[in-house]
């Protein structure tokens, strides 16, 4: 902590450090804002239920989109690997023909 304070002081100079020091006397914004403070959902009632339903629908839709993208990715991978298999099988056949030709030419 002392090392980081010295680094800040070196970068900001005297006036920058004074600003950092005076900010400590006020209420910290992260402490004053509770997570969800003043939110409609905490108040309960119809608005809270509606907000929760909208959030759930949003996340279900995002999940659907992500799964669709993942499915497409896997289908593309399968297609790519199938084409690669075909290409390699053609090469194997080509090499087998060369070997067969070489065996026949030896005799």
Swiss-Prot record:
Domains: entry comment: Forms an alpha-helical dimer with monomers associated via an antiparallel alpha-helical coiled coil composed of residues 74-106, leaving each N-terminal inhibitory region (residues 26-52) accessible for interaction with an F1 catalytic domain. The inhibitory N-terminal region (residues 26-52) binds the alpha(ADP-bound)-beta(ADP-bound) (ATP5F1A-ATP5F1B) interface of F1-ATPase, and also contact the central gamma subunit (ATP5F1C).
Annotated SUPFAM superfamilies: F1 ATPase inhibitor, IF1, C-terminal domain
Span list, region N-terminal inhibitory region: 26-52
Phosphoserine modifications at: 39
GO CC term, one of those recorded: mitochondrion
Compositional bias annotation for Basic and acidic residues: 48-58
Chain's role: Endogenous F(1)F(o)-ATPase inhibitor limiting ATP depletion when the mitochondrial membrane potential falls below a threshold and the F(1)F(o)-ATP synthase starts hydrolyzing ATP to pump protons out of the mitochondrial matrix. Required to avoid the consumption of cellular ATP when the F(1)F(o)-ATP synthase enzyme acts as an ATP hydrolase. Indirectly acts as a regulator of heme synthesis in erythroid tissues: regulates heme synthesis by modulating the mitochondrial pH and redox potential, allowing FECH to efficiently catalyze the incorporation of iron into protoporphyrin IX to produce heme.
Positions of modified residues (N6-succinyllysine): 103
Chief subcellular location: mitochondrion
Coiled-coil zones: 60-107
Keywords: Coiled coil, Mitochondrion, Phosphoprotein, Transit peptide
Segments for region (Disordered): 25-58
Pfam families: IATP
Transit peptide interval: 1-25
Gene that encodes the chain: Atp5if1
Record family assignment: Belongs to the ATPase inhibitor family.
Quaternary structure annotation from Swiss-Prot or TrEMBL: Homodimer; represents the active form and is present at a pH value below 6.5. Homotetramer; represents the inactive form and is present at a pH value above 7.0.
Record localization: Mitochondrion
Gene Ontology biological process terms from the UniProt entry: erythrocyte differentiation; heme biosynthetic process; mitochondrial depolarization; negative regulation of endothelial cell proliferation; negative regulation of hydrolase activity; negative regulation of mitochondrial ATP synthesis coupled proton transport; positive regulation of mitochondrial outer membrane permeabilization involved in apoptotic signaling pathway; positive regulation of proteolysis involved in protein catabolic process
Region (Antiparallel alpha-helical coiled coil region): 74-106
MF GO annotations: angiostatin binding; ATPase binding; ATPase inhibitor activity; calmodulin binding; enzyme binding; identical protein binding; mitochondrial proton-transporting ATP synthase complex binding
Source species of the chain: Rattus norvegicus
Keyword Phosphoprotein: yes
UniProt-listed Gene3D superfamilies: Single helix bin (1.20.5.500)
Keyword field contains Flavoprotein: no
Protein name per its UniProtKB record: ATPase inhibitor, mitochondrial
